[in-house]
Amino acid sequence: MESKAWESNNEDLLSSSGVTSNGGSSSSFFVSSIRGTIIENTSSAGTLTQVPFFPKYEVELDSPRKIIPSPGKEHFERVLEEYSHQVKDLQRRLNESNELHEKQKFYLRQSVIDLQTKLQEMQMERDAMADIRRRESQSQEDLRNQLQNTVHELEAAKCLKEDMLKDSNTQIEQLRKMMLSHEGVLQEIRSILVDFEEASGKKICEHDSMSTLHFRSLGSAISKILRELDTEISYLKGRIFPVEDQLEALKSESQNKIELLLQQHQDRIEQLISEHEVEITGLTEKASSARSQANSIQSQMEIIQEQARNQNSMYMRQLSDLESTVSQLRSELREAKRMYEDKTEELEKQLVLANSELTEARTERDQFSQESGNLDDQLQKLLADLHKREKELSLEKEQNKRLWDRDTGNSITIDHLRRELDNRNMEVQRLEALLKALKSECQGQMERQMAAIQGKNESLEKVSSLTAQLESTKEMLRKVVEELTAKKMTLESSERTISDLTTSLQEKERAIEATNAEITKLRSRVDLKLQELQHLKNEGDHLRNVQTECEALKLQMTEKDKVIEILRQQIENMTQLVGQHGRTAGAMQVEKAQLEKEINDRRMELKELKILKDKKDAKIRELEARVSDLELEKVKLVNAGSERLRAVKDIKQERDQLLNEVKTSRSELNNLSEEYEVLKRNFRNKSEEMEMTTNKLKMQLKSAQSELEQTRNTLKSMEGSDGHAMKVAMGMQKQITAKRGQIDALQSKIQFLEEAMTNANKEKHFLKEEKSKLSQELSTVATEKNKMAGELEVLRSQERRLKEKVTNMEVALDKASLQFAECQDIIQRQEQESVRLKLQHTLDIKELQGPGYTSNSSLKPRLLQPASVTRSHSNVPSSQSTASFLSHHSTKANTLKEDPTRDLKQLLQELRSVINEEPAVSLSKTEEDGRTSLGALEDRVRDCITESSLRSDMCHRSNNSLRDSTEGSKSSETLSREPVTLHAGDREDPSGCFTFTSAASPSVKNSASRSFNSSPKKSPVHSLLTSSVEGSIGSTSQYRSAKPIHSSDSVKDSQSPPIETTGKTCRKLQNRLESLQTLVEDLQLKNQAMSSMIRNQEKRIQKVKDQEKMLLK
């Protein structure tokens, strides 16, 4: 049993050793020791017992076996008791070790708390140290400044000392130079004295020579020489005085001679003045003759001017009549000006509204800029937050580097001091340069002083030279006295000639000046006279033109007088024939005179209106040109605006995209920052936990190592230990291996966390790069936004200008259209009145040719309807009937709206055919002449009426088209009335506008014959003026049917004078109709162009408004 127990114990030990072999290095050492003991037991088995398998602890029990030769139960019990005691001791030790471990944990926690408090205290101390260092740095900076100031002061003192030394050195050098110069001067004086002794042969010093004299004795020698020179000068002065007396005598003689010469010259000047006066009198006589000629020319010019005034008075009388019309037009212009002023006030109000809109737009722009600024501020705040985060990280890194920074700070301070020293050296160099400049100035001053000293020396030399010159002057005086006597004679002769020449020159200059003044006066007079002659020539030309105009007017007046005389003869003949109508003839003459005056006045008004019309046409053309230019500019601006709007839209889209990207990036940044902070916190917590766990594990390892050492010591010391103790030891080893596994897991976690930290740093670097990129993109977006804001402001200003221009152009076009419509209405009225007056005039003429109307049956259809109408409308005045006639024709003519120009051309062709038929017409009798003239006149009158009605229709159409175009109507709606269907005969016949059916012709004829027989005294003029429209139209058709009969009968006789006048009036009417036709065509084209331009402008304005609405949306 015991052997089995030992075997089981050995197996357990082996199994435990196998289990524990998977542990660390200490467990392997323990197993190796146990295996060594087992091998020893197996080797010693043969000597002790014969059992094949020995127990495990046989080696360890060798010592008790040696002591106790025979093992027994007591021994085993003792051993078991000892092992139990050992186990109890081990359990007690384990409990103690656990208690110690818990105490160590508590102490560690307390130490951690203490360390945290110490860290806080250290931080407080660090802050205090930082404050102390700041104060020390400030104190050090103050000390540095003080040291620098002291260094500056020392440098300044050093510079001053150096300057003093340099000044003293320069003064010493100057004194040396002065000494040398004085020595040279003294040597020169000595040499001069030696030369003076040699020249004069006198000895200055009796005992010594001048070459051996001392410098101190030179003064006495010079004084002696000066005394001697003074004595000689006084002697020479005594000799010069008589020479001066002689010179004064010579001067007095020369003055007397000069006075004589001056008297002679004055006499000569007086002679020349007298001669000059004689010449001036001759010139004045010539000038007076020229003035007389000019006066005669002026008298002739006055006569011509009087004649011109008389003629001008005649013209002024004519102009007075015109001025009355001008006054009326001025009143109209004043009214128009008032209208314009009202419109200008309205435009000013619109400008005030536009300015208010501008201010609103500016406020919107400011708000937009503020919003953009707020966005920029938000971006800057985010960037500042990021910078703060980065600064916090950098501060955490800098906390470890502050000790190194202290050393670097000292080195930086040293570098700063070195830089300051370099700067000071630079300043010292600058001061040295200034010192050099001052030195150069001082040298210049010293040179000037030396030059002054040299000047003094030169003055001394001059004194010595003067002494030599005195002797030379003595000799020269003698020569001069001799030369003076010779030159006096030459001076006298030259003075005489000079005085003569000067007097002659003065006289000539005076004469030249006087002649030049007279020449300038004469030239000015000649210029004035030439100007007057040119003015007179211009007036003469004007008078000639006026005379030619007067002659033309006279010819016209003679022609008119001839016509009037012919008419008077006819009137006299007609008065003899028509005595009954004398009263009416007088009234008609008065009316005729009034009508002539009115015709002349209306002609003048028509001319003025034509002039105004031409001016307005020119203005309209200018406005059209401006409108075209403005349209081109508007098209360009609209295209540019559309392009810019597209660009603005694209940029806005890009900006929105970028803002969305920025927002997403901001959200990502916020999320990343939050995650980063969370990771930081987690990392800090985990790092603290890991530090705590590592510290705990280290303590546990230390305690376990100490326990293992204790167990090893106990196992070595103990013998015969039990398997239970081994199990306890193996349990301890298992706990140690488990704790080592925990330590490995924690190390792997630490590595994982370090890798996570590296990844986080990489992500942080990547986020920094993205942040820099985003900041750059934001800066570019901000610049582009500013550019776009500027471009938007420019576009808005351009749009406002275009709107203002469009409004101005619309107002101008409205004004032009209104003025054009008014002009057209005035022209229509004037033309209608002129046509009415011409009708009255022609019918008055034909009234005076009136007898014999009842004899011919061909006149019955003509006077059929008028005679019947005169019964009912005899009391109605002629003007009202003609007005109703014209208005009815105008209403009938309004039905033709398809092609008015075609009808006008056909009417002109008819008028030309009528004019070509007129010269061939010649009747044998006066009755037939009157019939043909009346028929032709009535045809022409009716054609003129139809043409005037068509013209009024055209004007109404143009006015309606203008108004419809300004109101924004379409091209198909220019005609304001519904089209009226025409008959086939109206479309085929060009003159069928006023033809009617001849169904009622026989009844009309019967009624006409009865009425004419019953009232033979009625005049056809009155009947025509009071006739209705239907009778006139029926008579036109009957007259035209009767034309070939008259043309076949009227080939024999010549044409009468009234027919000639009617032909002239028809030609004039034809010319006027052609001009009116061209005007109507031009006006139609202009109206169409203006309507198209206005529509295009309206379309463009609508497009611009739509674009603005889109932009606002």
UniProtKB/Swiss-Prot annotation:
Return the Gene3D superfamilies for the record. 1.10.287.1490
- Which keywords does this chain's UniProt record carry? Coiled coil
Identify the InterPro entries for this entry: CCDC158
Q: Where is this region: Disordered?
A: 1-26, 848-902, 955-1062
One Pfam family linked to the record = CCDC158
Spell out the Low complexity composition-biased ranges: 15-26
Stretches of Polar residues bias are at 1-14, 867-894, 955-974, 994-1017, 1024-1040, 1053-1062
* Coiled coil, from the record: 72-183, 243-833, 1061-1113
PANTHER family in the cross-refs: COILED-COIL DOMAIN-CONTAINING PROTEIN 158 (PTHR47615:SF1)
Protein name as it appears in the record? Coiled-coil domain-containing protein 158
Supply the source organism for this entry: Homo sapiens (Human)
Q: Lineage of the native species?
A: Eukaryota, Metazoa, Chordata, Craniata, Vertebrata
